[in-house]
Amino acid sequence: MKDFKKLSIVSIVMLAVLFSTPKVEARMTFWDFKNKFVQTVKDYSGKAKDEYNKVKEDLKQEETTTTEVQEETEWNIVDYPDYWKSLGKSDIDFNQFPVNAGEYKYAKLDELGRTGTAYGVITLEKVRESAGWRQSWKGDVDPSGFKGNNKKVKFKSSKTKGKFYEADFYNRSHLIADSLGGDSIKRNVVTGTRMQNVGKNNKKGGMQYIEMKVLNYVKRTGKNVYYKAEPVYKNNEIVPRYVIVNAKSEDGKIDEKVLVFNTAEGYTIDYKTGKFYKN
């Protein structure tokens, strides 16, 4: 708006000069005016375009936050029977966290339709609001790699040796669990194996490990927990290899970073398409 005002003032002044000059010089002045006016418009237009592109790029960087694998971490049933690995203390800085207490933020889907990072500050109020019911799915909620690839399979039971239980191979796995106030929308779910979501069905594996830890702590203490869940992809694959979760309570009693593997014993996953095969 300021640039437009400047442009208008310049035009008025130049017109005044033009009409106050003698006729012979007016023709020359007119062409000078025309050229200068056109150049001025171009200059301001170019400046405005540069500013627009800068803001657009800044917003893109802020809102689309899919992460690629930096260092391959291999899963095996002996070392990681519950499908998660501790990475030490969290990376969370309270002063730099993008949301406030009781708020949630989900990245926009990237150009491949992949889910990005989710942030939330889990409060006792949000936990109580979510207790005893599940939020209905809203709109198109199938994450990248999910559609057409899911079917029921048999998994080894963690409760009875030699026994199996039947379940869907893939879940629409929440980045921020609905029990923690997370929304049932596409930007908050990834295509995750049953094991990535709940481990071996024993409430201490997969995403449930850190989710239950945070849930129980908030219920017990009433303290807020800062929570960040980040799906990690390799190159242009559309199913994440794993999810990295950072959780830190406001009193520092919970301060943890975990890697949750997106795989399943006895199966091979094509992360480029979401198809899977029994070994």
Task: Identify the meaning behind each predicted range.
Residues 1-28:
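Sec-dependent N-terminal signal peptides of Gram-positive bacterial secreted proteins and lipoproteins
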Residues 24-96:
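N-terminal, intrinsically disordered, polar/charged segments of Gram-positive cell-envelope systems
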Residues 16-19, 60, 88, 259-260:
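Compositionally biased amphipathic helical and low-complexity segments enriched in hydrophobic
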Residues 5, 20, 31-34, 38, ...:
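Compositionally biased, low-structure terminal segments
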Residues 99-279:
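Domain-level detector of nuclease and nuclease-like folds
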